[in-house]
Amino acid sequence: MTQRVVSIVGPTASGKTGLGIAIARRLAEAGERAEIVNADAYQMYRGMDIGTAKPTAEEQAAVPHHLIDIIDPEDTMSVARFQQLARETIADLQSRGIRPILVGGSGLYARAAIDDITFPGTDPDVRTRLEEREKTEGAGALFDELRAKDPEAAARMDPRNPRRTIRALEVIELTGKPYSASLPRYRYVIPSVQIGLDLDRPDLDHRIDLRTKQMYDDGFIEEVERLRPHLGATAVRALGYQQIIDLLDGIWDVNDAFADIAQKTKRLARKQMGWFGRDPRIHWLQALNPKLVDNAMAIIAHADAGDYDPIDARADEYTQHHLGDITA
């Protein structure tokens, strides 16, 4: 048997934090140590507590959490940097006999920790040169070049989207490999099992409405007011923070600001379900099922026994990849 990393995924407000803690406690009852590794990009920022639904002090005391409150809001967290930190943390925990439980928001971040994904980086000089060529030669000429260098990537990309064509050519020049070689693969590089939390849309929308109200009650306006001078270009993109900045500037009233937060959170949740739904390795469970934790533990036991390995090994065959920007 191989002790798997447990990755808990699903839309915002679906209860991932609670399930992660419940699994860790259940494992502890069986004599196995487990700790949580955060995969939510914005929960890594110090002080961004209410707006990111960061685990409370009590929750973090119940089960040790990693990669929370590790950078200041002025700093930048990239998925490539997170990948390095997450894999180092997972390796350290496993070396001490502790099972990592990955709990996260962004699908790309959660996958970056455990999947076959590389991030080639960028070169401003190469990017600028390609952008100048697009202006002088046209998007069609660049796409023809991509088609000659990487037919697989070109076959799946929209020739009317020069930004992605430029990115693909940039990666080819930087790596000397086809752009398609850098695409995310549905292939674990760390033995893992993914558990997804699913809710009917009305139930999820209700949870989001309750969370948004709780953000107001907990002092989200005051949090943003305090953090505003320190929010960098990345941190300020966390959902809800710009709405409160606009509220403080008199652009929104309080009701409209929080209504917009709720609406955009619901939209994000639907996008997240689309993202996670493309991964055939995820074992979906009903978040409101009273036997949720029991069902999750059964999945973990099957994964540790290798029961899912034959299906997981073929996951890439069933998946159409979305050719987006893979950047540092």
From Swiss-Prot:
Binding site for substrate: T12, A13, S14, G15, K16, T17
The protein's name: tRNA dimethylallyltransferase
Residues that coordinate or bind ATP: G10, P11, T12, A13, S14, G15, K16, T17
Example GO BP: tRNA modification
EC numbers, comma separated: 2.5.1.75
Signal sequence bounds: none
Site feature: Interaction with substrate tRNA: S106, R127
Protein keywords: ATP-binding, Magnesium, Nucleotide-binding, Transferase, tRNA processing
Enzymatic reactions: adenosine(37) in tRNA + dimethylallyl diphosphate = N(6)-dimethylallyladenosine(37) in tRNA + diphosphate
Organism: Bifidobacterium longum (strain NCC 2705)
Transmembrane segments: none
The family this protein is said to belong to: Belongs to the IPP transferase family.
Record-linked InterPro entries: Dimethylallyltransferase, IPT, P-loop_NTPase
Function recorded in the entry: Catalyzes the transfer of a dimethylallyl group onto the adenine at position 37 in tRNAs that read codons beginning with uridine, leading to the formation of N6-(dimethylallyl)adenosine (i(6)A).
Gene Ontology molecular function terms on file: ATP binding; tRNA dimethylallyltransferase activity
Subunit relationships: Monomer.
UniProt key word Transcription regulation: no
UniProt key word Kinase: no
NCBIfam families: miaA
Cofactor: Mg(2+)
Group of enzyme by EC: transferase
Pfam families documented for this protein: IPPT
